[in-house]
């Protein structure tokens, strides 16, 4: 590689060059679906240093299409850093000069952790559609085992956005003694009927692709690209607000004249197709199906006759709940539903709705007020954990 094409110097507020690690587990993991994973791998990255008392660990939980690479660069050839680099690094909201940050790829994922693309030891072939259904609870149990492996008894904070926020909530309920603070961003305590409907449309787009082969597409040396492309296009529409789409694309055409056909004419069409095409070759379709079903299934209040306040009763840590004004996928009203339940249950909670034009995807971006509030809360976490001079 010509040195002129390499990044000359990594940003000063970057965690720098990072490398994934793999933890292998031979202790069987019983799953909510009734099946058991006899063994499995979890791929993860860490940023910062674990202190002597092991009290500065922070866990990052990823969203639907996320993975372990949340910050930094794998090489100087990388065009982009990890997916949450805007918030993880020296001096950033999740300050790696203070905190030891862990980010992993969940079970069922397609970025190294055991999932549909991995080999099923019982058959010698890829798991494919035989990989068991996962739930948010299953992920949290596996994450707790990773914490055990790393010698971390209690996290200073567990943090996540979107589906990651649901995992944070589940952590506070399943392992209240192991989480000192919870940060739930752009999330919901359960999906609405509309959100389940969006997920079902995406799944049907994938499953109806002739190249899907009932999930065994790898054995046919193909990919259900068309279906996954459509699923991602639908998803992107829900991740952006109407205002964001309007300001970014409006009704702009790719050329000066209408072509009176079905080829791409509007810039927004071009954008959606590009996003879909890119995703269709970089993400696994079976993983997408699993992740959306885990979203659908999450509903901690269901076991309490729909009483969310009763469901959150086991939680014992302070919460920061963040929503965004134009997020219509998980709107502020759903965050307030969680906040109201926490208040009724007598739990300490701080809530803010950030005025942002960027819709659901705002949780990924460096919004000024969002960063300030996030950093302030994490500063309090550091203070309460005695990490100010770490």
UniProtKB/Swiss-Prot annotation:
Substrate binds at residues 232, 361. It catalyses: L-homoserine + succinyl-CoA = O-succinyl-L-homoserine + CoA. The record marks 329 as: Important for acyl-CoA specificity. InterPro entries: AB_hydrolase_1, AB_hydrolase_fold, HAT_MetX-like. One of its GO terms (biological process) is homoserine metabolic process. Keywords: Acyltransferase, Amino-acid biosynthesis, Cytoplasm, Methionine biosynthesis, Transferase. It is an enzyme of class 2 (transferase). The active site is at 162 (nucleophile), 327, 360. Its main location: cytoplasm. Coiled coil: none annotated. Belongs to the AB hydrolase superfamily. MetX family. Homodimer. This is Homoserine O-succinyltransferase.
